[in-house]
Amino acid sequence: MLYSLARPMLFSLAPERAHELTLSMLDKAHKLGIMRQTVEAKPTTCMGIEFPNPVGLAAGLDKNGAHIDALAGLGFGFIEIGTITPHPQSGNPKPRLFRIPEAKAIINRMGFNNDGVDKLIENVKASKFRGILGINIGKNADTPVEKAVDDYLICLEKVYNYASYITVNISSPNTKNLRSLQSGDALTELLQALKARQLELAEQYNHYVPLVLKVAPDLTAEDVEFISAQLLDFKIDGLIVTNTTLSREGVENLPYGNESGGLSGAPVFEKSTECLRLFAQTLKGQISLIGVGGILSGEQAAAKQQAGATLVQIYSGLIYTGPTLVKQCVEAMT
């Protein structure tokens, strides 16, 4: 109700300013104790972790982990922060975020703008949140793709003790050549290095933190087969399906519809759900799947579950539907 009143004002602002203002308002409401949404418990086990409910916040909303406590008050079963990189970076030039309300869509070309992994860890330490926290890691824009493994290893080592699970983001379309890591020897070398280090860290800290890969929806059936085989070979714990799409289907004739970047929101739902279904058919339950992409209703969350997801994540849907979407999704899922 409150969000439906605030939305016209927020939508009158530039998208990035509205994003900042929303998080600021959420923080203030949390401190005053007036922003707390009660969501039914629906315990769900995934990757050896018991989640209080299967609906999480996707990475990208809270890149630096600066708003964890306020976001936790919305009733999420888990929160994923990031994408974080070894060093701070400003991302791509503005404007870089575009709303397409006619299609309930967003295009972003943010470019992993973040304050660096050390700042994120400071924020996590300062948080009172003791729930399930995913940390999404990436590479700096000025790191050559041939050296990308080094950036992921730095982040893995630094966040290991602060994360419930760690997501390896190789699917953002907004960092040059990043998606090339989804194929061939590049993927093999990355997963091999990360898995070896994960096992060393698990032994060192006597605590196993699951490793999750996040992929794009713009994959062929052959890509799905190859990625699935690699995930199984290296015993990766989970897969997030999917990131944003490069397709412009459904928005090509709308204002901002042909801006460069990744498209999210309603138009990506079918594409990402089909990709999820393909991975589910290929992996046959051997790896946990997390469905994300275009969820704007409880029914769509349930559809992701039917396509093979154990958990779901939302982000763009929150912008168009508001925080009640969390509750709707939890209620619709089994």
Curated annotation (Swiss-Prot):
It catalyses: (S)-dihydroorotate + a quinone = orotate + a quinol. It is found in: Cell membrane. It is a peripheral membrane protein. One of its GO terms (cellular component) is cytoplasm. The keyword Oxidoreductase applies. The active site is at 172 (nucleophile). This is Dihydroorotate dehydrogenase (quinone). Its cofactor is FMN. Keywords: Cell membrane, Flavoprotein, FMN, Membrane, Oxidoreductase, Pyrimidine biosynthesis. GO terms for biological process: 'de novo' pyrimidine nucleobase biosynthetic process; 'de novo' UMP biosynthetic process. CDD domains: DHOD_2_like (cd04738). Pathway: Pyrimidine metabolism; UMP biosynthesis via de novo pathway; orotate from (S)-dihydroorotate (quinone route): step 1/1. It comes from the Bacteria. Its EC number is 1.3.5.2. FMN binds at residues 59-63, 83, 136, 169, 214, 242, 265, 294, 315-316. Signal peptide: none annotated. GO terms for molecular function: dihydroorotate dehydrogenase (quinone) activity. PANTHER family: DIHYDROOROTATE DEHYDROGENASE (QUINONE), MITOCHONDRIAL, DIHYDROOROTATE DEHYDROGENASE (QUINONE), MITOCHONDRIAL-RELATED.
